[in-house]
From Swiss-Prot:
It comes from Streptomyces griseus subsp. griseus (strain JCM 4626 / CBS 651.72 / NBRC 13350 / KCC S-0626 / ISP 5235). This is Phosphatidylserine decarboxylase proenzyme. Is synthesized initially as an inactive proenzyme. Formation of the active enzyme involves a self-maturation process in which the active site pyruvoyl group is generated from an internal serine residue via an autocatalytic post-translational modification. Two non-identical subunits are generated from the proenzyme in this reaction, and the pyruvate is formed at the N-terminus of the alpha chain, which is derived from the carboxyl end of the proenzyme. It is a peripheral membrane protein. GO terms for biological process: phosphatidylethanolamine biosynthetic process. Pfam families: PS_Dcarbxylase. Catalyzes the formation of phosphatidylethanolamine (PtdEtn) from phosphatidylserine (PtdSer). The gene is psd. It is an enzyme of class 4 (lyase). The modification Pyruvic acid (Ser) is found at residue 185. Pathway: Phospholipid metabolism; phosphatidylethanolamine biosynthesis; phosphatidylethanolamine from CDP-diacylglycerol: step 2/2. GO terms for cellular component: plasma membrane. It is found in: Cell membrane. GO terms for molecular function: phosphatidylserine decarboxylase activity. It comes from the Bacteria.
């Protein structure tokens, strides 16, 4: 089993693009309540939960630097492998569940060109539920050395907004940041026929680090 942490994040940690609508109001409220808490007990009572919430938001939207692993296909998401399923067209789908505690920035599994980015409206049931197949999603297609690679970002019960970073036609490097799913959710990657899967159900993955395929 590959080690998903051997090339873990190095260097600084920044805030993910697309976090502002949630993060800025929360941090501003926490800062205001802390400033007024010195003069008012009522504001002191407000400062505790708002500061805790702001700290949680900063953690949720962290975007650490990564040393990208060498390999044909690397994980697009931090999380846990939820399922590995043979698909009707010969491909293999690897589904990675992202909890609210994981990094929510997704990365390109291979180098190539973005040939399609399609937003599909849908529901918001928990991403580990079978009904999540009908959730809101963004479907990516990449033209790579292995041919067409499909990756799907799926919104969950908490994560109700997917933020793609790149438009169609963009050339990407392996491990490059391509989008954000706010809070918890799921990412599926479809491996072409003939590509062996290196991960196992229940294995932790790190975006840009864990190798998905086997030589």
């Amino acid at each position: 089993m590959p080690d998903s942490t051997s090339s873990a994040s190095r260097g600084g940690v920044r805030i993910a693009r697309g976090a502002s609508p949630w993060l800025l109001p929360t941090v501003a409220t926490a800062a205001l309540s802390l400033a007024r808490a010195r003069k008012s007990g009522r504001w002191a009572a407000v400062a505790v939960p708002t500061t805790a919430l702001a700290a949680g938001m900063l953690w949720f939207f962290r975007d650490p630097e990564r040393e990208i692993t060498d390999g044909r296909v690397i994980s697009p998401a931090d999380g846990v492998v939820q399922s590995i399923m043979p698909w009707k067209d010969g491909r293999t789908r690897v589904a990675i569940f992202m909890s609210p505690l994981n990094v929510h920035v997704n990365r390109a599994p291979l180098a190539g060109t973005v040939t399609s980015v399609e937003h599909i409206p849908g529901g918001f049931v928990p991403a580990f539920n079978k009904e999540s197949e009908n959730n809101e999603r963004v479907v990516w297609h990449f033209d790579t050395e292995l041919g067409d690679i499909e990756m799907v970002q799926i919104a969950g019960a908490v994560a109700r907004r997917i933020v793609p970073y790149l438009p169609e036609g963009t050339k990407v490097e392996q491990g490059e940041r391509i989008g954000l799913i706010r809070f918890g959710s799921r990412v599926d990657i479809y491996l072409p026929e003939g590509i062996d899967v290196a991960v196992e159900v229940g294995q932790a993955t790190t975006a840009g680090v864990t190798r998905i395929d086997r030589d």
